[in-house]
Amino acid sequence: MAQKERGEREERDNEFVDRLVHINRVAKVVKGGRRFGFAALVVVGDQKGRVGFGHGKAREVPEAVRKATESAKRGMIYVPLRSGRTLHHDLEGRHGAGRVLLRSASAGTGIIAGGPMRAIFEALGMQDVVAKSLGSSNPYNMVRATFDALKHQMHPRDIAAQRGIKYSTLQARRRHLVDVEG
């Protein structure tokens, strides 16, 4: 019975894509000198709209990455995607001195983002997005700012429900705006 459960757990792990974003060597100063350890930042996603990030620390790199991956799987969020490939609307996220701007993009644009943000979008399964990092370029701040923005992503049905209007009315207004701008 226990053997079968392990096999099932491994199958579930295979559905996730993990990306190592950053590794940092840290030192603890002790009487005899310095003790070195490693801190890892990992992004995990199922490429279907779920993504999470985690931070792990250990004396060896593989152990730090494993801890970060487990932490990322525990803290996953769901992000609704338009047509399974891009954002529904533009977003802004902040964390510390880090600020990111995320914009939805037309089909074929690709992922136009740097560093840690690209890893998040690839793990999320997003295909078209334009992202700009402003302020801090610290990977931890950029990842947390990107997640702050993604948490505020709303499906148009939810927006229509909040406004108390029909979804079809909201879609008609959107099409009208696209026709006027284009």
From Swiss-Prot:
The record, for SUPFAM superfamilies, names: dsRNA-binding domain-like, Ribosomal protein S5 domain 2-like
What single Pfam family name could you report for this chain, choosing any that match?
Ribosomal_S5
Report the residue ranges that make up the S5 DRBM domain in this protein.
16-79
Alphabetized, the UniProt keywords read: Ribonucleoprotein, Ribosomal protein, RNA-binding, rRNA-binding
Q: Name one GO biological process term.
A: translation
Which terms in the GO cellular component ontology are assigned?
small ribosomal subunit
Claim: Ribosomal protein is one of the keywords in the record: yes
One GO MF term attached to the UniProt entry? rRNA binding
Gene3D superfamilies recorded: 3.30.160.20, 3.30.230.10
User: Does the record bear Kinase in its keywords?
Assistant: no
| Family as reported in the entry's similarity comment | Belongs to the universal ribosomal protein uS5 family.
Q: What does this protein do?
A: With S4 and S12 plays an important role in translational accuracy. Located at the back of the 30S subunit body where it stabilizes the conformation of the head with respect to the body.
Cite the record's note on assembly: Part of the 30S ribosomal subunit. Contacts proteins S4 and S8.
Task: Show the domain comment.
Answer: The N-terminal domain interacts with the head of the 30S subunit; the C-terminal domain interacts with the body and contacts protein S4. The interaction surface between S4 and S5 is involved in control of translational fidelity.
Annotated protein name in UniProt: Small ribosomal subunit protein uS5
What species is given as this protein's source? Bartonella tribocorum (strain CIP 105476 / IBS 506)
Q: List the gene name.
A: rpsE
